[in-house]
Design a protein with these regions (language model features):
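Thiamine diphosphate
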Residues: 1-141, 202, 206
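Glycine-rich ThDP/TPP pyrophosphate-binding loop and its adjacent helix/strand module
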Residues: 49-61, 103-238
Length: 238
């Protein structure tokens, strides 16, 4: 897709996020909106996936570590054709399969249930390790929040991923510097994020997470990186 096509798709996803959260009268629109361009590039350009066969064995995997931004993931999956866009207005409604956090048992295209912050990277690392063990070519992507990486489990997983040289793993950090309690750097600063991942043997790329030229270049660089996992620190607007 061209950048213009990606931008148009991302804007459609943003519209769906607002519609879904408005229908639910609750949810997390901010982090969903800040991640929209990342979601768009992953699902429409980067990942090897098939909406008609969501459990395809050799598909690339995605783990939404910051599971509270489910409206962003759901809107992307619907736009990509995993389920009808009309279902988005049932977000968080009683009886809907689209609840407040992703559920791998009920939502097509969701590879892992998530929501408890800090745990998604560990799951993604496990998936990547299994891929290496089984000699598979699939890649594993996970999206974390900059507030989420205040959780210690993130760094345990990062240490192991770097030690095992999981070059089939890409961690994207949505660096919007906002969490519920305030500015991330004032609540409990994780900065400099890039230096921390580098210390655990990650290849680190800093980008504007709302610029498709930079997003495209970063994922290309990640694919070309061998012998270590990649962390993309994406500065976004929330």
């Amino acid at each position: 897709m061209t950048n213009l096509e990606l931008e148009k798709t991302a804007n459609e996803i943003r519209k769906s996020i607002v519609t879904a959260v408005h229908s639910a009268k609750s949810g997390h629109p901010g982090g969903s909106l800040s991640s929209a361009d990342i979601f768009t590039y992953l699902y429409f350009e980067e990942m090897n996936i098939d909406p008609k066969n969501p459990k395809m064995e050799d598909r690339d995997r995605f783990v939404l570590s910051k599971g509270h931004v489910a409206p962003g993931l759901y809107s992307t999956l619907a736009e990509r054709g995993y389920f009808p866009k009309e279902d988005l207005v049932t977000l968080r409604h009683t009886g809907s399969y689209l609840q407040g956090h992703p559920d791998m048992k009920h939502i097509p295209g969701v590879d892992m249930s998530s929501g408890s912050l800090g745990q998604g990277l560990s799951v993604a690392v496990g998936m990547a390790a299994v891929g290496k063990y089984d000699k598979k070519d699939y890649r594993v992507y996970t999206l974390c929040g900059d507030g989420e990486i205040q959780e210690g489990q993130i760094w345990e997983a990062a240490m192991w991923a770097g030690f095992k040289k999981l070059d089939n793993l890409v961690v994207v950090v949505d660096n919007n510097n906002l969490q519920i309690d305030g500015a991330v750097d004032e609540v409990c600063s994780p900065y400099p994020i890039d230096k921390k991942f580098e210390a655990f043997n990650f290849h680190v790329i800093n980008i504007d997470g709302n610029d498709f030229d930079q997003i495209r270049a970063a994922f290309k660089e990640a694919r070309e990186t061998k012998g270590m996992p990649t962390a993309i620190i994406a500065k976004t607007v929330k």
